[in-house]
């Protein structure tokens, strides 16, 4: 069975777009792959974080994974900072990366421009740590969006470089892009991806939004003026985005949605979608609360940490042996 790895930062509550584009797809693939789902809190601290808020959001994200349908008997869910091998392997990969290739990373450039009190070194060395996250578990598949594709390509380059210098120690991962239609856009500006860090709360629906508030956001979402319910990302981005959300939450094919609402106006469609979103959030949040407030969540994270440590420790030892670190035993 091939291995799949995915990491999400606990830097905010995931949106309904994250659910449709990632979490829901993870539930589908956990039967077909040996899956590792990592809450990458060490990546989060490359930018300043409030420690209490970070810990709360880490626990929230773990509960969200489980509420989405991740089964701890099928997949490994764990917290990055609880498995020391990540920073160990991250440092080893940092030593074979060049400053030039790290400075060329688009996310580094974007975040460096926003840095107020100097550029944190962690922003620059973020990609080798991300590469370590992946290679530690002999990962074959990494599902990512366009914004992370460059980092995975760097990971593949670092694997090639490491294997060339120290023999074939690491597995080279392949990139898997999200399914077509899995990309959910901003509700008020459907040319931009929905983001949990958006300054305007009307642009996104958080998985922990109050359901009635989320329904209002759907009803006020931007659409065009012709009133025809048709999936056309280039010419009708607003209604296309809402159709994507409808399809993502109901599993109804897009063609069937178009047929169902043929001759209907946007008001009817938005009203129905608002109720679908509301019902989804009510059920989702009930599951979330049952995990967040339970000791079972800690048991699952302990179990995931122990398995991740066992697997990653073996990879780190292979890397250290290849590089000549430590004593020969």
UniProtKB/Swiss-Prot annotation:
Compartments where located: Cytoplasm
A GO CC term attached to the entry: cytosol
Principal EC category: ligase
Binding site for L-tryptophan: 133
Cited InterPro entries: aa-tRNA-synth_I_CS, aa-tRNA-synth_Ic, Rossmann-like_a/b/a_fold, Trp-tRNA-ligase, Trp-tRNA-ligase_bac-type, Trp-tRNA_synthetase
Binding-site residues for ATP, renumbered to this chain: 9-11, 17-18, 145-147, 184, 193-197
Motif segment ('HIGH' region): 10-18
Keyword presence, Ribosomal protein: no
Any one Gene Ontology molecular-function term assigned to this protein's record: ATP binding
Pfam name, any one: tRNA-synt_1b
Catalytic activity, EC: 6.1.1.2
Gene Ontology biological process terms in this record: tryptophanyl-tRNA aminoacylation
Keyword annotations from UniProtKB, A to Z: Aminoacyl-tRNA synthetase, ATP-binding, Cytoplasm, Ligase, Nucleotide-binding, Protein biosynthesis
Entry-linked NCBIfam families: trpS
Entry similarity comment: Belongs to the class-I aminoacyl-tRNA synthetase family.
Quaternary structure, from the entry: Homodimer.
Entry function: Catalyzes the attachment of tryptophan to tRNA(Trp).
Name of this chain's protein: Tryptophan--tRNA ligase
